[in-house]
Swiss-Prot record:
This is 3-dehydroquinate dehydratase. Signal peptide: none annotated. It comes from Cereibacter sphaeroides (strain KD131 / KCTC 12085) (Rhodobacter sphaeroides). One of its GO terms (biological process) is chorismate biosynthetic process. The active site is at residues 24, 101. It comes from the Bacteria. CDD domains: DHQase_II.
Length: 147
């Protein structure tokens, strides 16, 4: 069994720390990767972080994860509310999936309240800032280890 966890991020998350810091905070995607790698390493896992502003590239990463990852943490960002393609790709992945959002999407605009990804996710974290990624990695480690 592989011990790699894919952490997939959707559009505009490359601007984390710069774009709307009042909502998303001041930490960057590199900070997310560093923090998640440390959490995973404590449990004997590794992470592979990927970000794209393109839906098809995220779908391709999910397809790759079918062979290379034990679990997926995904923040699909705006694709959360629109992407049946990402949902379908996640249905083809057999391991655990945790959906993660930095902000509490349920306290924001009503169009953000619906998630296609939640139809496949084993758990959803929203509103914990980037700490939510760490919580998601901990849970994926547990699920991949059989817990």
């Amino acid at each position: 069994m592989t011990t790699t966890i894919y952490i997939l991020n959707g559009p505009n998350l490359n601007l984390l720390g710069q774009r709307q810091p009042e909502i998303y905070g001041h930490e960057t995607l590199a900070d997310v990767e560093r923090r998640c790698a440390a959490v995973a390493a404590e449990k004997g896992f590794s992470v592979r972080l990927f970000q794209s502003n393109h839906e098809g590239a995220i779908v391709d990463q999910i397809h790759e994860a079918r062979q290379a990852a034990c679990g997926i943490v995904i923040n699909p960002a705006a694709y959360t509310h629109t992407s049946v393609a990402i949902l379908d790709a996640l249905h083809a992945f057999e391991g655990p999936v945790i959906e993660c959002h930095i902000s509490n999407v349920h306290k924001r605009e009503s169009f953000r309240h619906h998630s296609y990804v939640s139809l496949r996710a084993d758990g959803v974290l929203a509103g914990f800032g980037i700490e939510g990624y760490e919580l998601a990695v901990r849970r994926i480690c547990s699920l991949c280890a059989g817990g």
